[in-house]
UniProtKB/Swiss-Prot annotation:
Transmembrane segments: none annotated. PANTHER family: CLPXP ADAPTER PROTEIN SPXH, GLUTATHIONE S-TRANSFERASE KAPPA. Keywords: Cytoplasm. Interacts with Spx. GO terms for cellular component: cytoplasm. Belongs to the SpxH family. This is ClpXP adapter protein SpxH. The keyword Cell inner membrane does not apply. It is found in: Cytoplasm. Adapter protein required for efficient degradation of Spx by ClpXP under non-stress conditions. Interaction with Spx stabilizes Spx and exposes the C-terminus of Spx for recognition and proteolysis by ClpXP. It holds the Pfam family Thioredoxin_5. The keyword Cytoplasm applies. It comes from the Bacteria. It comes from Staphylococcus aureus (strain COL).
Length: 268
């Protein structure tokens, strides 16, 4: 897993007028078609579970020419353009849009599927997003303007690839740290601890069945990242849940997935 750790100059955040917060702010630039971004999403989920009180993650679909060209090539209209769909979903809240893109990546990456309007609509509804409001928002020109703002942010932070994370402490005069590419989990926790500058306590993950119920569809790699159990033990627990008819195993070209058969937990 290759990547580059690089210190950013503090002007990058000040120039785009981002307000400081009382915790570490992480900007995550992603490509919805990238398998590395898909893998990083599991790491970010674990970071949010363990360090929720210390971090705030903002996801930005990397609006580079390469990514937007892929989005356009996959689409026939606004209704199946993943970049515009993401910006429209974003208008209904951070939690919902994150669940939406998680569901979409679960459709795109393992199945190697072409994006369709029905796929987007299914993921929108499963993410707890109002479908009619979403469709109305898709027709608004402000989505294009929002993408331009994201492009400006990416340029100011000198984002050249996805995935890329940029870490900021609460002090706008402090330098940010940019991490390009995919790294082991402990690299990200080290950065968080260094930026906090004091001992911090980690939260424990939820019960296995609760996490799967929240996410609806998960990879084996994701669960191994979240729980850090031996694979044999994790398989044993998954089989127990399958016997109880709470989950089912799905096989895709890029590996095995586990799908929840329990009622989904509604987004707040």
């Amino acid at each position: 897993m290759a990547g580059e750790l690089r210190i950013m100059e503090n002007k990058s955040r000040e120039d785009i007028n981002l307000s400081p917060v009382s915790k570490i702010e992480i900007y995550s630039f992603f490509d919805p078609f990238s398998s590395d971004c898909f893998k990083l999403s599991a790491i970010l989920s674990k970071l949010r579970i363990e360090y929720n009180q210390y971090i705030r993650i903002r996801h930005i679909l990397n609006p580079s020419l390469k990514v937007l060209t892929k989005c356009q090539a996959q689409s026939t209209s606004n209704f199946d353009n993943i970049a515009l769909a993401y910006k429209a979903a974003e208008l209904q809240g951070r939690v919902r849009v994150e669940r939406f893109i998680h569901l979409m990546q679960n459709e795109i990456i393992p199945k190697r599927d072409i994006i369709t309007e029905s796929m987007i609509c299914d993921c929108i509804q499963n993410a707890g997003i109002d479908l009619e409001v979403f469709k109305d928002d898709l027709q608004k020109s402000k989505l294009t303007e929002s993408l331009k703002i994201d492009l400006h942010i990416a340029r100011e932070m000198e984002i050249e690839q996805a995935p890329s994370l940029v870490f900021f402490s609460e002090d706008v005069h402090e330098e940010g740290l940019k991490v390009e590419g995919l790294y082991p989990y402990h690299i990200y926790t080290y950065i968080i601890n260094e930026l906090m500058g004091k001992p911090i306590e980690k939260n424990l993950p939820p019960k296995l069945e609760t996490y799967i119920q929240q996410q609806q569809l998960v990879t084996m790699e994701e669960l191994l990242t979240i729980y850090e159990w031996p694979e044999k033990l994790l398989n044993k627990e998954l089989k127990k849940l399958a016997i109880q008819q709470k989950i089912e195993k799905l096989k895709y070209p890029d590996g095995d997935f586990w799908k929840s058969k329990m009622p989904k937990i509604k987004s707040k």
